[in-house]
Amino acid sequence: MDQKAYGIHMGPAKCAVDLGDGSERGGYVNQDYILQKLGRPHRAISLMYCYYPLDKGWPGRASVAHASDSVSFAWDYPYDDYFTYKGGLDGNLSDEPFTYMRDVRKHGQDVLLTLTIDPHVSDEHLIAIAKDLTTFGRVQLRINHEATGSWFSFNKRCTYQEVADFYVRFHKVVKEYAPNVQTILCIGGIEDENATEMLKEKEFTEAVKVTDIWSVDKYITLHYGWPYDIAERGGKSHYCKTAEETYRLAKLSYNRFCYLNAGISKPMVMSELNADGDVTGQIKQANIMKEFCDFIKEDKEQWLSGFTMYQFRDDGRLGLEMTDPNNKDVGIEQPLLQEYKDIIHDDFFQPVMTTKEEVTFPVTLRWGGSEDADGIIIPIYLEKNPVFFEVYFEEELKELNIMMCIESMWFYKAPLVTCIDIMPTFWKNPLSEGKEVSLMLFAPPLDGENKNTGSADWMINSYTVIQKLPKIRVRYESTEEC
């Protein structure tokens, strides 16, 4: 095949979609599996960890280090029962969450790190954490989320003003030592449509002003007593709202954030969003999420920058998959997964692609994150639905780390892999006639980290030189007529 190639820029979606992958309710699932199940990468993958290095039992997970039969609520341990952040002061960057952060970035996604942290740690700890993140490109850091609540350990050991002041302190450290990182302030926002202020608004006003991103967590329905009881009608450990009410409350929160910031807007996200199948049943759960996303699409104001689906695989009923109780390495697909897959393949939630001029080789690709990347696009005319469609990365091309997209379906090529079979695209959506299709290639960092090249932009941008196009094999007939 004689092919031409053009530059292509990947920019932000009208509303970005992020995905939770691991929390107190479930373990991390590798990005190869998630990509195969959902057919596209996300803007960011949300990883949830805690940092309480001054506590007894650290760095053991709280439910292991402080195991007790008397515990009757998920947050009853001395510190938060997330997996523990192994970085920080005297940390180990070969452990969690860094192994997962590299996996996330190799697959063309940004890192969204949630960290609950003891407000009493010194600046030395905060500086170490900030430095941990400098090689991971455009990181979003959600510090002590749901900070106007009462369940997390940082709220139990500090006043709300102290929690808010700590947020501002940590934000300033991040800006000085890791300018590639954006901070997310996640508080309760407007929780009653008749409220004129947000909960603990006075305490958090300064944090609202300094943060990079505003956020609220909203579960349309939630069984917060899980896993210690069963949600039954009339019970006291769950609640149920409507998609419309939840959407209105989130939008009212955004408007109040703007008011507190002198009318100046900032990006607004919902860092945890779902309906709990424990309350609704799994089929209605899927319907509710579709309804909520329809509200996002239909709102002309487009005030929401993105949301995080909580989560991919869950031990309860808050996941696209439920963890198989017989084997935690296996996920049981829920009705929500197919509904969510349809949602994220809607153009409204997909990154915007802009084709540029024809390129000549060698060509340099730039990865500035999932919302700012420059790749190449190869137009290919197909006479009819193919029987074979393969992309070969030979010689020096085999070393590359590549994300590819054709007909809205994404594929990953890891370093040293030489052939990617594109045919799943055409099994699922066969062509009925000849058509020109486009193969897009992007090059996220080879090992998931940016290299300090000494350039001014190294914390944000990673560059990859491609010497030539990969070989494309298309056949319209079987190898033999057997």
What are these regions (language model features)?
Residues 1-34, 41-42, 49-52, 140, ...:
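Substrate-binding cleft of secreted/luminal carbohydrate-active enzymes
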Residues 18-133, 295, 299-301, 312-315:
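N-terminal carbohydrate-binding/catalytic regions of secreted carbohydrate-active enzymes
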Residues 31, 190-215, 280-284:
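Substrate-binding cleft/loops of secretory-pathway carbohydrate-active enzymes
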Residues 45-49, 201-246, 310-315:
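Aromatic- and acid-rich polysaccharide-binding/catalytic face
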Residues 63-64, 68-82, 91, 219-279:
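Glycoside hydrolase catalytic-domain groove-lining segments
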Residues 130-160, 184-190:
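Active-site groove signature of glycoside hydrolases
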Residues 171-199, 263-278, 304-314:
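Aromatic-lined carbohydrate-recognition surfaces of secreted/lumenal glycan-active proteins
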Residues 299-413, 434-436, 446-482:
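Aromatic-rich peripheral "rim/lid" segments of glycoside hydrolase catalytic domains that contact
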